[in-house]
Amino acid sequence: MTPRQRLTVLATGLGIFMVFVDVNIVNVALPSIQKVFHTGEQGLQWAVAGYSLGMAAVLMSCALLGDRYGRRRSFVFGVTLFVVSSIVCVLPVSLAVFTVARVIQGLGAAFISVLSLALLSHSFPNPRMKARAISNWMAIGMVGAASAPALGGLMVDGLGWRSVFLVNVPLGAIVWLLTLVGVDESQDPEPTQLDWVGQLTLIPAVALIAYTIIEAPRFDRQSAGFVAALLLAAGVLLWLFVRHEHRAAFPLVDLKLFAEPLYRSVLIVYFVVMSCFFGTLMVITQHFQNVRDLSPLHAGLMMLPVPAGFGVASLLAGRAVNKWGPQLPVLTCLAAMFIGLAIFAISMDHAHPVALVGLTIFGAGAGGCATPLLHLGMTKVDDGRAGMAAGMLNLQRSLGGIFGVAFLGTIVAAWLGAALPNTMADEIPDPIARAIVVDVIVDSANPHAHAAFIGPGHRITAAQEDEIVLAADAVFVSGIKLALGGAAVLLTGAFVLGWTRFPRTPAS
């Protein structure tokens, strides 16, 4: 690599590091944020979900703006938006202001995510060098994602909850400076007109889909009509979008990309990998904090094998693609994710050292998958459509992360709701008291959350506490194992698709 190429990798890598860290780091600060804004669980969840929703809604628009007005200029704009909104997040004005700031932060994250990959692709036209560059970029970013719980726990314990947002200010300044000094500007050589109709149909469609996925765990049978209406509206908007894109002279998304079976397969497998990665991180963090009752810092430290494995595998994946082609690394790493989940599920309730080995293998599998998939996705398009291709890949990551958290979380919640009432029948004979405790535990995803209902004036006595916790812990462990099994099913489908679609030949 030339010195300028190294600066490009560093600048874009640190940018995506900020984005991935903020996906998860705020979870550690939620108890403190809850006290400041005096809000309940639903308000907190939307404060978190606003980031992902804002990011998912505008990814493709960011790609088009970057291709037209300059990818470096748009990247710098995204970094600036991200830093300014991070500052607003620490102002104790109201929960509404905090949530809006998180949405705007997601908008900035969308610019950073899409344009960092597009800038990287432009700076490395050679496929072999591009594979190495993407592997380094992905390693930096995903280490941020997986290390966020530990980093957040350390910062919240030592500096307070505002530090998880204020850290973006100096980091953003470094990214801003490195980009202006070391990254070349690039854009579509034949800039197109802005596809306003495409944006006005795609953005609300993606927002509705993301909203439905985020809210899915809270919907009940009475909400079926509302859910159907949301999905119908999203479907109509997508139909209008596709119809318009077929006719548009300058489309937001070139639908010819999807005519290539390989590109479609890359998007699907990448969606599955990101779903399983982010969904599993959420479930495992929940296990360490809520079931094992570890502190945020201790739980974060237990998660460190995931970024360690991810980072090492990401760095090696580029060389593996150049030597063996994309199929073997992807299939091997999908199998590693499956095996890592199996090891963790078997040992999670009694053998922590073995469970940590499973997390390391899982992280390595995810890191080794991401680089070949991004390499395949970016090499299938010409440089003029690099922003568009990067936007589609980042959209899969964003929606995949939302879907994975909702999918695995729904499995755990459904299992708890079905199994806890029968399991606690002996500990809490009174059906009314039992229903109250079950609702509290399921809503908070915490077997210890029933403590507020124990004591004078309540139907549950303090003597029942140990039995309730033991029973709830056992059901939680079973639910988490079931959720990990759901992730394994998704990985199996991705493995079959990769086996049949991905090329075996190395990059030339």
UniProtKB/Swiss-Prot annotation:
This is Drug efflux pump JefA. GO terms for molecular function: transmembrane transporter activity. Involved in resistance to ethambutol and isoniazid. The keyword Transport applies. Its main location: membrane. One of its GO terms (biological process) is response to antibiotic. InterPro entries: MFS (IPR011701), MFS_dom (IPR020846), MFS_trans_sf (IPR036259). Disulfide bonds: none annotated. It comes from Mycobacterium tuberculosis (strain ATCC 25618 / H37Rv). The chain crosses the membrane at residues 9-29, 46-66, 75-95, 104-124, 136-156, 163-183, 194-214, 222-242, 265-285, 297-317, 328-348, 354-374, 399-419, 479-499. Belongs to the major facilitator superfamily. Efflux activity is inhibited by carbonyl cyanide m-chlorophenylhydrazone (CCCP) and verapamil. Gene3D superfamilies: MFS general substrate transporter like domains, Multidrug resistance protein D. Induction: Induced in the presence of ethambutol or isoniazid. Keywords: Antibiotic resistance, Cell inner membrane, Cell membrane, Membrane, Transmembrane, Transmembrane helix, Transport. GO terms for cellular component: membrane; plasma membrane. It is found in: Cell inner membrane. It is a multi-pass membrane protein.
